[in-house]
Amino acid sequence: MKKDLLSIYDLEAGDFKAIFEKARHLKSVHEQGVAYTPLKGKTLGMIFDKSSTRTRISFEVGMYQLGGLALFLSNRDTQLGRGETVADSARIMSRYLNGIMIRTFSHLIIEEFAAHATIPVINGLTDLLHPCQILSDLFTIIEKKGSYERLKIVYVGDGNNIANSWINAAARLPFHLALSCPEGYDPDSGILDRGVKEAKEGVSLMRDPYEAVRNADVVYTDVWASMGQEAEQEARARVFRPYQINEALLSPAKKDAIVMHCLPAHRGEEITAAVLDGPRSVIIDQAENRLHVQKAILEILI
């Protein structure tokens, strides 16, 4: 693997296999209650400009279970919040730490940090991309379906960082990705154009969610308004209402289709409680797998 994991595009075919095999091993070891501490003596810095539940807990617990230490750093805890340059912070933290995970708004910040750091930098989430989530989702699909190859994976909702990262994944791996977003809420145009050109099994964007979901193996959604878009919540709710994942919208999907959501979910908005808690939903396993996949990433990179 490359030094950093900022995007799915940082991974080659062999890297996906290595991460998923390592995650499978780490999950088995965890379930057996066997101590496995390859990162003993190693420290991960975790920089958070955005609040988090799953990202913080999974990385912090993951480092602990691997024998290492995780340091939580908000923008109030570092000189980054007081005017120190990203480049200076990256160089200095590289002397203290063995790796950095960053959850921030601008993707440019994490790219600049990685350019000046001499230690691995992991993208815990930016407004543009969320690679760790998609890797965990792919691992979950392998567990539930045996493989993601040749499947039809459908994303319904806002063209946000999750949608962008799914497009990146479809350009690297052999599955068909269909996206359904309201007009004006499409994924990043540059990412979409590249994904359409490079996709192994095809990337398609359509307005009709029922047509998108037809014969789907996996149906995926996310919140309609991401962090920082709270002022748009009411307007977005009106636009996105036809894109709610409910029993009617799932009817064109395959009978054994699974439903995924990266969480947190707004029940009754992008997805109904009946579907979220229903037999097709794999959201709890999906959330758990953030821990195992990110542990695999940490062990490989650090």
From Swiss-Prot:
Gene3D superfamilies, alphabetized: Aspartate/ornithine carbamoyltransferase
Q: Which residues bind L-ornithine?
A: N161, D222, S226, M227
The record's keywords, sorted A to Z, are: Amino-acid biosynthesis, Arginine biosynthesis, Cytoplasm, Transferase
Q: In which pathway does it act?
A: Amino-acid biosynthesis; L-arginine biosynthesis; L-arginine from L-ornithine and carbamoyl phosphate: step 1/3
A Pfam family hit:
OTCace_N
Protein function: Reversibly catalyzes the transfer of the carbamoyl group from carbamoyl phosphate (CP) to the N(epsilon) atom of ornithine (ORN) to produce L-citrulline.
What name is this protein filed under? Ornithine carbamoyltransferase
Source species, please? Syntrophus aciditrophicus (strain SB)
